[in-house]
Amino acid sequence: MAKASVVVPEQVGAAAAAQVGCPCPGTTLFPYPPPRAGIAVRRKCLQAAQQLELGAGLRGGWVESMRASSPTHAKAAAALAAGVDEEHAAWMARHPSALGEFEKVVAASKGKQIVMFLDYDGTLSPIVDDPDAAFMSETMRMAVRSVAKHFPTAIVSGRCRDKVFEFVKLAELYYAGSHGMDIKGPASRHAAAKSPPHNKGVLFQPASEFLPMIEQVHQRLEQATSSIPGAKVENNKFCVSVHFRCVDEKSWGALAETVRRVVREFPRLRLSQGRMVFEVRPTIKWDKGKALEFLLDSLGFADCSDVLPVYIGDDRTDEDAFKVLRRRGQGVGILVSKHPKETSASFSLQEPAEVMEFLLRLVEWNRLSRTRLRL
């Protein structure tokens, strides 16, 4: 059966909009036009980052990629003064606000089960200098709890699953930590009662064999970066993060070279970069997109046309999930960002406060819809 639960912003144009009614299976109906030239600098940095993930590139390439991951960098301010307002308007036309297009988003869910996927840092909580202090507000927790009462809800984070649970403190959710390499289902009886029998307490760890190696690289990175002020190494169980948000920019090159040197000692691990952070992960083909598909399958929605996955995230690692939605030709990808950047998401929200507003509106819309059905 065709998957037609797709939302296309009107601004994308008639060519994309004309595809909405196409019943052909496998057709991509999302608005994914080619990126405009206005994002050329950021695209160049992202391409450099992709090469660096493969071990290529010089120290300078790493530093440029690190700057690209810092939207508040002085270069961003200079670019804004140079006329980024026009670029931002063009980007918003391609990735309009999920709040402004809310009715279009929920219209796509008619006759379908919404399943929510939420990143944590930068999505449910603000980005802070100390990753151990990235607490979500109580109002955000209430919003997520309300969403979970109406829709199956998962937190998909690069953090250690246990750490994310400490922050969120909601037992009725699914948690996918370490970029989806550590997945566990709801613990509460109420949540389990609403889940398929084969899904209760699901636990999936595709990278278990890497645990000793991750511990080794964590120790090596802590030792190697101890002389660089501000560098923080975090063990996320199945991956290791090296945060450089508090590192002086003059030391970025030295930090990048240090991290690369350590990771080269572990050929079965790969190095990538996120938002002001280096990520060291196993080389297995598993990411947030794979986690999204695994969770949909666990919920009984594999290859179903009566489901609408909604994924909200702010980081490069969330792009894997956005690309899965694009490939499936169904669902809603929402990027959280105040700055234009290349993305496979359909819509955007600027900050966690807007994410909370979107979640609360979704809950209220669902309540009103149920009330109308009873009348």
From Swiss-Prot:
Keyword Repeat: no
Record keywords: Hydrolase, Stress response
Presence of keyword Hydrolase: yes
Gene Ontology molecular function, alphabetical: trehalose-phosphatase activity
BP GO terms, sorted: trehalose biosynthetic process
InterPro entries to which the protein is assigned, alphabetical: HAD-like_sf, HAD-SF_hydro_IIB, HAD_sf, OTSB-like, Trehalose_PPase
Cofactor needs: a divalent metal cation
Domain of life, per lineage: Eukaryota
Pathway the protein acts in: Glycan biosynthesis; trehalose biosynthesis
Catalysed reaction, written as an equation: alpha,alpha-trehalose 6-phosphate + H2O = alpha,alpha-trehalose + phosphate
Cited Pfam families: Trehalose_PPase
EC numbers for this chain: 3.1.3.12
NCBIfam families: HAD-SF-IIB, T6PP
Protein family membership: Belongs to the trehalose phosphatase family.
Known role: Removes the phosphate from trehalose 6-phosphate to produce free trehalose. Trehalose accumulation in plant may improve abiotic stress tolerance.
Protein name: Probable trehalose-phosphate phosphatase 7
Organism: Oryza sativa subsp. japonica (Rice)
